[in-house]
Amino acid sequence: MPCVFCAIIAGEAPAIRIYEDGGYLAILDIRPFTRGHTLVLPKRHTVDLTDTPPEALADMVAIGQRIARAARATKLADATHIAINDGRAAFQTVFHVHLHVLPPRNGDKLSVAKGMMLRRDPDREATGRILREALAQQDAAAQD
C-alpha cells in the first residue's frame, strides 16, 4: 500500500499545510486530539526511529518547537505535548516517521496514562490559517 504521507508531500492527497521547507512538511492531523494537533513529516520517507537519521529527528523537533510557540502565541494552547509513536506497539498507524505536536488548553482532558479523548476541530481551515500567520510573524520578528 502506498504511503499516505508521501502522497500528501507530493501534493497527490489533501492536507491542511502549516509549514513547509525543502526537507519537511507540517500538516494538521486529520483526527486531532486537540485543536491545532499538527504532524511534522520529513519529506524523505523513513519508517521509524531505526532508519531515520538523527539530524532529521533534530530538525523535526525544531519545527515542532516553532509550531508550539505559534500555538501559544495565538492562544490555541497553554502547553505542548511533543511525541513520536515509534512502531505498532506505540500506536504508530502510518509507517512514515512523524512528530506529533499537540497543543492542549487548560481544562482539556488529555492524558497519556488514561487514554486520549478525541476532539474535533470546529474549523480546521481557520486553525491552519491561524498557525501559518503566527509562524510568519515569528519569521518576521527573527529578521528584525
Swiss-Prot record:
It comes from the Bacteria. Residues 4-111 form the HIT domain. GO terms for molecular function: catalytic activity. InterPro entries: HINT, Histidine_triad_CS, Histidine_triad_HIT, HIT-like, HIT-like_sf. It holds the Pfam family HIT. Gene3D superfamilies: HIT-like. A motif (Histidine triad motif) lies at residues 96-100. PROSITE patterns: HIT_1, HIT_2. One of its GO terms (biological process) is nucleotide metabolic process. PANTHER family: ADENOSINE 5'-MONOPHOSPHORAMIDASE HNT1, HIT FAMILY PROTEIN 1. This is Uncharacterized HIT-like protein MT1300. It comes from Mycobacterium tuberculosis (strain CDC 1551 / Oshkosh). The lineage of its organism: Bacteria, Bacillati, Actinomycetota, Actinomycetes, Mycobacteriales.
